[in-house]
Amino acid sequence: MPPAPLITIVDDDDFLRNSLNNLLRSVGMRTHSFSSAEEFLNSNELHDTDCLLLDVRMPGMSGLDLQRQLNASNSRIPIVFITSHADDDARARALAAGAVAFLYKPCRKEALLEAIDLALNHKVP
C-alpha cells in the first residue's frame, strides 16, 4: 500500500498551521509545516511533497514568490493557496501560474479537502 499523501503547509500563522495539521492527519494524510517560504525551500521536504498549502502574504518571501520560484525550477508540486486577504489580482496571478485552488480563510473543511483531493488527483508526474 502506498504511503499517505504528504501535504506541506507553509503559513506564518501558528494557530492555522496547527489546525491544518490536526485536520489533515485526522483524515489520514501526512503533514509537514513551515512558518516561511524560506524555511520550506531549505528543508528536505521539497521533493517529497504531494501538495502544498500556501499562504499568500508572509514575512519575507510571499506565497506568490515561492510559486514563481518553484515554477522556474520546473517543480510539479500542486499548490492550493489559502489567504485571509481578498485580493482578486493575487488570485488571478496564482491561478494563471498553475495553482489548483485559491481559498479564503476561514474556509470550510469540505472545500479544503476537495481542493487537496483535486490537487492530488491532477498531479503532473
Regions found by a protein language model. Give the residues of each.
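Acidic catalytic/metal-coordinating carboxylates
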Residues: S35-S36, S62-D65
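Two-component/phosphorelay signaling modules centered on CheY-like receiver
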Residues: D14-H32
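Acidic, metal-coordinating helix/loop segments flanking the phosphotransfer/catalytic sites
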Residues: S33-C51
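Receiver (REC) domain active-site loop signature in two-component systems and cognate sites
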Residues: M58
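Active-site residues of response regulator receiver
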Residues: D55, T83
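Short, conserved "switch-loop" micro-motifs in signal-transduction and mechanochemical regulators
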Residues: S73, S84-A86
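C-terminal output helix
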Residues: D89, C107-I116
